[in-house]
Amino acid sequence: MSDAHNAQLDWDEHGQPLSRSYGDVYFSRANGLEETRHVFLAHNQIIERCQALPAGGRLVIGETGFGTGLNFLCAWQAFAEHAPRDARLHFVSVEKFPLTQTDLQRALALWPELAPYAEQLLAQYRAIHPGFQRLLLDGGRVVLTLMIGDVLECLPQLDARIDAWFLDGFAPAKNPEMWTDSLFTELARLSAPGATLATFTSAGFVRRGLIAAGFAVQRVKGFGHKREMLAGPFQAEPAPRSAPWFARPTLAAGARQAVVIGAGLAGCATAASLAARGWRVTLLERHDDVAREASGNPQGVLYLKLSAHGTVLSRLIVAGFGHTRRLLERLQRGSDWDACGVLQLAFDAKEAERQNKLAAAFPDDLLHALPQTEAEARAGIGLPAGGLFYPDAGWVHPPALCRQLAQHPLIELRPYQEALSLSRQQERWCVEGQNGVLAEAPVLILACAAEIGRLLPEANLPLKRIRGQISRLPANESSSALRTVVCAEGYVAPARDDEHTLGASFDFHSDDLTPSVAEHAGNLELLREISQDLAERLDTQTLDPATLQGRAAFRCTSPDYLPLVGPLAAGQAFNQAYAVLAKDARQVPETPCPWLDGLYINSGHGSRGLITAPLSGELIAAWLEDEPLPLPREVAEACHPNRFMLRQLIRGTGSPT
């Protein structure tokens, strides 16, 4: 695919952008800033609603047509100036053709008044690929969820309650595919009680469609030369949400304290997302510091193993990659991470065919094919083939990311605290260790990989451990030519601290974490398959595997290779409540889900933890805070811990897989 998923723009004599595809302007030529304030802010009472927010309150705005981000920045400015300091703004917007960062910067330069907000947006506006993309701004106080794609495909996948709608986008005459009854029905489904809507158009079919969907809109004075526009409240009953087994548990009022077990990527990310929302978090770690197990490798690779068919896993990976990539901007490039790119070699005919399909399915700025000569020039070493290049990817020092995530005044890291048992007493979870209670709180998040099975055996979660070993190879002047991560069956990364990381093995049977000479030898063989040239530069022909340093750890994965992220039901009560599904899987009983109150899971990330674990922290926080989910509803449900009990019930099997 080319870069055609980005907006194709022309610029007029005043430096204002016009859409080449729709033949329409992005905002009023007279004064786009004042148009936004009149149409969307004033007629949704945004300033008044910000002023009325309670301490710790939240305003959720939904928008069709992100465009130049002008509406978002105006709403953010109003929120910053009028809302309580501990309030939060969630802004959810759909955009089929996002602007490039260069075009966005040029467009926003028209509004110097918004520069403090535009600068933050531009700093985070990277890896904006198809699907859901979450951007954290103003220290996490402002959350922007961009849905990149067609509005009628994105909105049905949104799980949110919207307080105010900015119904924007190109004019109905220019973009009739958007302005349909299907759109108005989705706006109604997503509206919170008391929601409002405003739009620049006063077209009769739009007004009639909105009224039919439950919006009591009226024609009011428009902006500038536009005589009329539409605005009004949502007055219908809110639509029911998910099936009960995927519904959001009710959280007891004031329960904004949590214990997180496990200070790897999943645990640190969960703690960070909760702390950003004002939660006090106790982070329990059985070792001396964060990232001492699977998250402790010197270099991990941001590698996107995708499908050309838009699978749930692919959508999770693209969304997670964007989120992690934006988080990495907080770290020190060169020592903590590097966006050096990742090259996946087309090492055989089957892989080459798979890569051709991927190159046709995804935009060039996410991945594109390189022939062998270009791949060698990009990598700086000789290669056996060309492959797919991911220009925004690279390597990460996972402990640095974990430390950054855990550094928050509301997070208390407690090392040398090994959890041995759990109990629920007086609406609080108690975590007990060898010498008594380690911590207690109304909410408990288990982010301790396969150890969840030991702490919660009755849940029968099908988590499994897979041993992996990396090898550390001393770099030399010749090997410093390597400029990108290169992958085949294994991977090798450019040097960090004068060492290349090489890996990684997969062992489904061993429980021994002592690095083995045999697996060092296996990793060296993986290196030779990646690049005989680099292997020779590193003198592997004379290198004794027994002299290599390395480390081994357990990956934690699930049977469907998706993580487990979200709340968990009590197994026996779940089976009783939904026994009818064993006879008819189409039934959706109204019985509320028998949740294990206050218990959440963030585990099973396998070898993709760098990509999926940080965004999963946001997903946990969204479940707890009843916020817009950062992932498509279908993806969030596919990652739900209850899915295994549900499958077991429907299939009538004894296995939860």
Curated annotation (Swiss-Prot):
Question: Which transformation does this protein catalyse, written as a reaction?
Answer: 5-aminomethyl-2-thiouridine(34) in tRNA + S-adenosyl-L-methionine = 5-methylaminomethyl-2-thiouridine(34) in tRNA + S-adenosyl-L-homocysteine + H(+)
List the InterPro entries.
FAD-dep_OxRdtase, FAD/NAD-bd_sf, MnmC-like_methylTransf, SAM-dependent_MTases_sf, tRNA_MAMT_biosynth_bifunc_MnmC, tRNA_MNMC2, tRNA_S-uridine_synth_MnmC_C
Give its E.C. classification number: 2.1.1.61, 1.5.-.-
Q: Name one GO cellular component term.
A: cytoplasm
Q: Name one Pfam family in it.
A: DAO
Region (tRNA (mnm(5)s(2)U34)-methyltransferase) residue spans? 1-235
Give the span(s) annotated as FAD-dependent cmnm(5)s(2)U34 oxidoreductase. Answer: 261-657
UniProt entry keywords in alphabetical sequence: Cytoplasm, FAD, Flavoprotein, Methyltransferase, Multifunctional enzyme, Oxidoreductase, S-adenosyl-L-methionine, Transferase, tRNA processing
Superkingdom, according to UniProt? Answer: Bacteria
Q: Which GO terms describe its molecular function?
A: flavin adenine dinucleotide binding; oxidoreductase activity, acting on the CH-NH group of donors; tRNA (5-methylaminomethyl-2-thiouridylate)(34)-methyltransferase activity
Where is this chain's protein located in or outside the cell?
Answer: Cytoplasm
Task: Kindly list the biological process annotations in GO that this record carries.
Answer: methylation; tRNA wobble uridine modification
Q: Where, by residue number, does the polypeptide cross the bilayer?
A: none
Kindly list the cofactors needed.
FAD
Q: Which family does the record claim for this protein?
A: In the N-terminal section; belongs to the methyltransferase superfamily. tRNA (mnm(5)s(2)U34)-methyltransferase family.
Instruction: List the NCBIfam families.
Output: MnmC_Cterm (TIGR03197), PRK01747.1-2 (NF002481), tRNA_MNMC2 (NF033855)
PANTHER family named in the record:
SARCOSINE DEHYDROGENASE-RELATED (PTHR13847), TRNA 5-METHYLAMINOMETHYL-2-THIOURIDINE BIOSYNTHESIS BIFUNCTIONAL PROTEIN MNMC (PTHR13847:SF283)
Q: What does this protein do?
A: Catalyzes the last two steps in the biosynthesis of 5-methylaminomethyl-2-thiouridine (mnm(5)s(2)U) at the wobble position (U34) in tRNA. Catalyzes the FAD-dependent demodification of cmnm(5)s(2)U34 to nm(5)s(2)U34, followed by the transfer of a methyl group from S-adenosyl-L-methionine to nm(5)s(2)U34, to form mnm(5)s(2)U34.
The name under which this protein is listed is tRNA 5-methylaminomethyl-2-thiouridine biosynthesis bifunctional protein MnmC
Which species is this record about?
Answer: Ectopseudomonas mendocina (strain ymp)
**Lineage, please?**
Bacteria, Pseudomonadati, Pseudomonadota, Gammaproteobacteria, Pseudomonadales
